[in-house]
């Protein structure tokens, strides 16, 4: 019984451990989102885009939004 509990504990600890590769992957995705925003002429802004711009996408999972200026003729 003790061996079974020990094995179960080891498996739980092993599978609950987050590897650094997962953190690096998340960082690369966020960097790609930020690069895409700047590539299409956007800028990152908190909460709501200003009046002279429109929402394009998100820069990060937090409340940063990618906004793009509206050209006025």
Curated annotation (Swiss-Prot):
It comes from the Eukaryota. InterPro entries: Defensin_beta-like. Its main location: secreted. Disulfide bonds join 37-66, 44-59, 49-67. Pfam families: Defensin_beta. GO terms for cellular component: extracellular region. Belongs to the beta-defensin family. This is Beta-defensin 10.
């Amino acid at each position: 019984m003790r061996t079974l509990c020990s094995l179960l504990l080891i498996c739980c600890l092993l599978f609950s451990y987050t590897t650094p590769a997962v953190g690096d992957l998340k960082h690369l995705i966020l960097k790609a989102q930020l690069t895409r925003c700047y590539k299409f002429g956007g800028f990152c802004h908190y909460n709501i885009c200003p009046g002279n711009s429109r929402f394009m996408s998100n820069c990060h999972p937090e409340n940063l939004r990618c906004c793009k200026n509206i050209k006025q003729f």
